[in-house]
Amino acid sequence: MSKIAEKTKMHRRTAWQIQKDLEKDNTIWGYTAVIDEQKIDRVIYVLQFKTKHLTKHFADLIIQRLTTEQPVEKGVRILDIYFMNGLYDVFIKYSAPDHAIARNYYETLRSIYRDYILETQLLSDVNFSLVQGGKVNPELKKIYDLVPKITPE
């Protein structure tokens, strides 16, 4: 908080009070570290799918599932979930230690939300994170590792 106060030319107490007010009305919530999932032997997966219209029952099911932390019990770590407008309605970014666990989570979601998910689903694994949590990857140049090596014939 001292650095923020210094950069904004405020007193620390004023900056602290603004932070508390923003926390109180949930303008800001949760303080997290950005984790390189690959360095802890996990793979990031992105699941996108279309849904039927949102109903109260569907919303209740989503809230119940997210507040019981059931995915954690299965070895899955939820990174982000968005309800969107566009080609897909739901975007879920999660990590798992292997493809079998990731696929099992995907199948579990399909089963739980079977009355709401339309057939279009897209499951991808992430090769490299360029920006995560609003932070540019400090090892950004590792993207060059993905460039195919061309060997002369």
For each feature predicted by the language model, list its residue ranges.
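A compositional/biophysical signature of low hydrophobicity enriched in polar/charged and small residues
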Residues: 1-153
